[in-house]
Amino acid sequence: MSFKMNRQGELSLSFSFILAIVIIAAVIGVGFYMISYFLGLRNCAELGLYKRDLQIKIDDAWNSEETRESYTGAVPRSVEKVCIGNLSSVANSADYAEIYDKVARFDESGVNLFYYPNPGGNCKIVSGSLQHVRFNGFDCIDVVRGKATVRISKGAFDSTVLVTP
C-alpha cells in the first residue's frame, strides 16, 4: 500500500512546526525580559534597604547619649557613589562639583541622600531624605565592591547626628 501525501498536508505540517518555533522564541524572549525586570527590582530594593537601615542607625544614635560608629550597607554595583549633604551647601571637594551639579536637579525639601549615577532601569529611587542629621557640606562616599560606609557620631550635647564619609 502506497501512502501519498498531498501538498496541503506538507504545508500544514511545516506551518505547525514554524508556529511552534515562533511560540518557543516568544516564551524565551518573555523569560529574559522578566529576569532582567526582576534583577532591576533587586537593585531598587537594595537602594531602599540601604536608606532604611542607615536611618535606623541614625535613629539609634539620635536616641543615645553619645555615639561614634560606622554603618556599611549594600548598594547595587551600578551605583559608584552615595552622596550625602544638603544641596544648599557647597560641595566639599572639586571632585564632587560635577556630581553636585547633576544631583542638584533633585533639590526637593529635605532631600539629603543621593545615589550617583542614577541607577536607571525600573528603579525610580535616585535620592532620599534622612531625619535627625547634619552634614559638613556635600560629600560623596565611594562604593567599594557594592558596599558604602559612612561614619555616624553624636556628642552628649548634640541635638542631631553628624554623618560623614
Predicted segments, located by residue:
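Long, compositionally biased, intrinsically disordered regions
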Residues: 2-3, 15-165
